[in-house]
Amino acid sequence: EEQAKRRPRKRRRRRRISPQAFPVLIALALIVLVGGFMTGKFLYNKYSPSKEMMDGNEYFGLSDDDSMAVIMNNELLEDKAKFIDGRVYLNVETVYQYINSRFYWDSTENLYLYALPTELVSVGVGSTDYTVAKATNSEDYVILRADGSDAYVALDFIKEYTAFNYEYWEEPNRVHVITEFGSKDVVTAQKASAVRNKAGIKCPILTKVNKGDTMYVLDEPEEIDEWTRVLTADGYIGYIKDKRISAVTKTEIAA
């Protein structure tokens, strides 16, 4: 029997891409690449933390070189101090309201007075001297300064008659005064982190903390999830992510 003849296989023709199609394909590829890039950029901008640093003078509301912000315990005051010749001077009204109401500013006589149980302390504007009863004493700095209708007293002088602690920093000028003592809530930074002006990763950074830095925990004006309001060791009040800090512990503040 004669073997069946094998039918030759038909060769498939390879489709060649028309030269006219290349520009279209390149354009489509570019559209995909640009679209992917724009999507990635959008997602990055939406979910990545801002690295913007807020200007310290703007945050503290400082308008000139000798102006100084005042953090009184856990509150940033609207009142401003003066930083002159390396010393902190508080407005006499700030002293009266927040530190010691027994100090009195006599604007008529330009005298600053303090009543001891049996004696009167008196100091004049621009003077390094002060009197206790009839005795004259001296400091190595100007105790009382005037600026228009305002008077400013050296914080070191107030400290001689009042129990409080204070610490100050420059650039920007700010002073932290502590008059409330006892047990305070604190947290510790678990890693290097940013403290922001408000609770949000897109909010400007006030300052940065390192691993192990301690911060005071402050009451929040409203309940905010995942963030804690803190006062940093360098005098900034802001917000830090909860996942970046330890659990709350207690510390004692002594005079």
Where on the chain are the PLM-derived regions?
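DE-rich, low-complexity intrinsically disordered acidic tracts
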Residues: 1-2
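Primary recognition of N-terminal secretory signal peptides and signal-anchoring hydrophobic helices
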Residues: 5-194, 199-221, 243-255
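Conserved glycine-centered beta-strand/turn positions repeated across beta-sheet architectures
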Residues: 207, 219, 228-230, 237-240
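SH3/SH3-like beta-barrel fold
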Residues: 114, 212, 227-232, 240
